[in-house]
Amino acid sequence: ELQDEGMTAVFPYLEGKTRAELLGEILTAQGADAEVSAIRAAMDEIYSIRPEERKPFAVTPEFIKVFNALGELDSYRDKETENGGGWASLGAVLADESCSASNIDALFENMLVTADGTYAIDYEWVFLFPVPAGFVKYRTLVYFYRRYKSLLGGQAEREFIGQFPEYVKADEKLLSLYEAMERGFQEYVHGENQRTYQEDYMVKTKTLA
């Protein structure tokens, strides 16, 4: 609910468990085989996107600014032409669908499962420019793996991801590119841009008893 002429957002208090917690309980109680099925069901729930909100991915200046903050994607930049170097090579490797809005932090730990349904509780990093859908799903799987890898029987990260080819292509070049994009995103969030972001959007907060 918006108040104060749209300057204040008030959210209801929600009770439940995160999807990560519920998946962790399944992993602990039933093992990795049951976990794979549960993860698939959770991914299908999160990424059930209406067809009209999907479109082909295309590289944009905004995409480069966020995901190439470290310059690791420069090797995919095309040679200079009379119109300037383009990113067709990068777009070819990342060829995928994208959504009209991409919540980069659509992680299992950011999905609260309540009696009334599942709610996204962290949407600070929602981008309105095209982002490869596979990369967003990759982050969901990778962050779950990193949290629970001690319970996954010694599986390597890519081995774990390889169990879900319907969400993330098991392609070494693509996965390496996703890793570079993740490092670029972290630099964008926590590097020099973080100070600017905080200064631009800093607001006073008040805790209500």
Task: Give residue spans per PLM region.
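Conserved structural core of kinase catalytic domains
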Residues: 2-85
